[in-house]
């Protein structure tokens, strides 16, 4: 249990710092739909596609690795709560089209990126 908690904590710390750095680096470019949040979610979608495929192909790895990467790092990197707050702000400002666009780009984009991550691993496993 202790190793699981440590793995999740280490991964979550690295993921949260990565998300914060993406926000610092990109959110000033286009504050209406902060690109740091979008990049974190799209990158997280891609990486979870890779991770799920990798761990499915390597079931003998200790479970702490999956906890570190998926529950910890990707849980800290991706940010549904920030996305929700940003969309709510757009709705409160009456920017319905922007809110709808943000929802579409985050949700559809993350799903597409997850599929691309899985496809990447499929291609790598063939070679």
From Swiss-Prot:
InterPro entries: FluC. It is found in: Cell inner membrane. It is a multi-pass membrane protein. GO terms for biological process: cellular detoxification of fluoride. GO terms for molecular function: fluoride channel activity; metal ion binding. It catalyses: fluoride(in) = fluoride(out). Keywords: Cell inner membrane, Cell membrane, Ion channel, Ion transport, Membrane, Metal-binding, Sodium, Transmembrane, Transmembrane helix, Transport. Na(+) is not transported, but it plays an essential structural role and its presence is essential for fluoride channel function. It comes from the Bacteria. Pfam families: CRCB. The chain crosses the membrane at residues 6-26, 37-57, 67-87, 96-116. One of its GO terms (cellular component) is plasma membrane. Its main location: membrane. Na(+) binds at residues 75, 78. Fluoride-specific ion channel. Important for reducing fluoride concentration in the cell, thus reducing its toxicity. Belongs to the fluoride channel Fluc/FEX (TC 1.A.43) family. This is Fluoride-specific ion channel FluC.
